[in-house]
Amino acid sequence: MNNYFFFFLFFLNLYSQKESPFENLNFIKIVSDNNNEIYKQELDKLRTDEASEIDIIKKEILVATKFRDLKKVILLINRQIEIEGESPDLLYQLGGTNGILAFQKKKFFSIIYLNEMLKSFSKGLVLNPNHIPTLAAYIDALYSVPKILGGDKKKAIKLAERLSEISKIDGHLSMAMIHFKNENNQMSNFYLNMFFEELSSLSICEKENPKICFSNKSNNFLIKVSQITSFFGKEIDSGLCALNFYIESSNFKKNLYSLEWIYYLKSKLTFLNGNREESMKLIKLSLDLNPDFELSKTFLRINF
């Protein structure tokens, strides 16, 4: 699975560094325009390869993702769909990429991307009603997007209930998110506790378990696990193993999150796990990348 979908909370300030268990779009790294020439050179190299069109498209998607040219990513995914046909995975990627662009744009300009996001997720679920990443993404989108723009809170709740029947851990997480955003702390905590119990039972830190546990989930699920465990200080080992698996996987080259945030999460989890020395090294790495990253500055000031 690819990691193109991220949570959609459309009233966040893009540049804020607010910490929340269910918000992470504001930690997407935006690459400077200074890299445009390097980007062009990398694309030009691909076009000289003797490969099929579909292989070149897949490589171009990786390069465009690396340089955050998300409009290009959308064009390439649409071309891939023209060649290979629609699939839940491709529609999930397409919906997620449109969602990121919707978040980055001003509200008026985000409407077209919101529509494309919702349409892609809906079509993906027609092809496979049990596609877990799409279900989780669609639930979040439907609950977060204003009704006038296509959101539907009642539908989101029904889908979350269905998701719980397919995957308990994903369903519990979606229900916790819904109640958290609705400021119903009692129900949010109820589903979070169920999520943590399910996470504990998966024993993802055992040697072969991560591949088994995450085989039908998006890479973003790993980030969700590490983010939520670090925020609530529960199931720390599982959160750390999930984050390490994310960083060490071959799909990390598709990572869109800022490395300073990734190092912050790992530093916090490592600290909570009792390793202050390693945590200090990681938080310094975060601040070396971005000396103004407030979460890391605050964490360093309070804990060291």
Ranges and model annotations:
Residues 25, 59, 93, 100, ...:
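"A position-specific structural signal for the A-helix of alpha-solenoid helical repeats
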Residues 68-75, 86, 92-123, 127-130, ...:
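Short coil/linker segments at helix-helix boundaries
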Residues 28, 53, 62, 87, 96, 103, 131, 168-170, ...:
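Residue-level recognition of tetratricopeptide repeat
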Residues 56, 90, 134, 171-173, ...:
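TPR alpha-solenoid repeat register
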Residues 140, 144, 213-261:
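Alpha-helical adaptor scaffolds
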Residues 45-46, 80, 124, 162-163, ...:
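Canonical positions in the second alpha-helix
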Residues 15-75, 89-92:
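N-terminal leader/linker segments that initiate helical-solenoid repeat arrays
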